[in-house]
Every structure is written in structure tokens, then in C-alpha cells.
């Protein structure tokens, strides 16, 4: 971890490690810090603070991104067949489709076109397409 990040986080690990959802003094201090961080990030991104969502990790983030997109836009989702289950599971839940990959683990663009065309022909809206840029398991 970058030394500046460690220095910024040290007070929250050593002294102010309260649950920011609590009602006691330490929790209120932690909540204030979370809210201030949200404001800083929102300003950097040019969005409202309420649009910035903190999650507990990657799986929760993937689920929120896919399910939130489907719920907000309607339709379903598409992902590659080699995605992590944090992506595959919500795509499956929303009756989405998977796209094949080539022998070297790249997205099969012909299959992607075919899947999207068949969904469009069937009147299915596609809210989100999620494909990983690299895969740590197969080295692509």
C-alpha cells in the first residue's frame, strides 16, 4: 500500500475504528469521516455525494453494478463465460446471457454480436455488458 494511504488510514485503524452506523461518539466521528470522504470523491468525479456508494468488497460491488443497472434501465445483462461468479451469478439471476471466449481467453466478438442481435430480435433490452479486461486464472 502506498505510504500516503497508510498514513491517512492509520488514525482509523489505531484510534477511531468504530462502526460508522453506531450512535456513540466514536461512531459519529467515523461517520463524519466517511461522509467527508464521500464528498471529496464526489467532487473529484463531478457527481452528487449521494451517487457515491462504498461497499465491503469486490463481490458486493459487482452485484450492485449489475443488479443496479438492470433495475434502473430494465432488461437484463450479458457477460463473458469466464467471469468471476460475483458477475456470473447476478447475470444468471437476471436471466442474462454469457458470451463465449476464444482459445486464448479473449471475448469472441462474433458470439457477442450474435448474442446481442438475438436478444434484440427477441425484444430483450440489454442494460449492461460486463467483460473482464484480464483474467488472472488463465493469464489473458
Regions found by a protein language model. Give the residues of each.
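Pyridoxal 5′-phosphate
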Residues: 1-140
Amino acid at each position: 500500500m502506498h505510504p500516503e494511504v497508510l498514513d491517512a488510514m492509520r488514525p482509523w485503524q489505531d484510534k477511531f475504528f468504530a462502526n460508522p452506523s453506531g450512535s456513540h461518539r466514536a461512531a459519529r466521528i467515523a461517520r463524519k469521516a466517511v461522509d467527508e470522504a464521500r464528498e471529496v470523491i464526489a467532487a473529484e468525479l463531478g457527481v452528487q455525494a449521494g451517487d457515491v456508494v462504498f461497499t465491503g468488497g469486490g463481490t458486493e460491488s459487482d452485484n450492485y453494478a449489475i443488479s443496479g443497472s438492470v433495475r434502473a434501465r430494465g432488461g437484463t445483462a450479458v457477460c463473458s463465460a469466464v467471469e468471476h461468479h460475483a458477475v456470473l451469478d447476478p447475470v444468471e439471476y437476471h436471466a442474462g446471457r454469457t458470451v463465449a471466449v476464444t482459445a486464448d481467453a479473449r471475448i469472441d466478438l462474433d458470439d457477442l454480436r450474435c448474442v446481442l442481435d438475438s436478444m434484440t430480435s427477441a425484444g430483450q433490452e440489454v442494460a449492461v455488458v460486463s467483460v473482464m479486461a484480464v483474467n488472472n486464472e488463465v493469464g489473458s
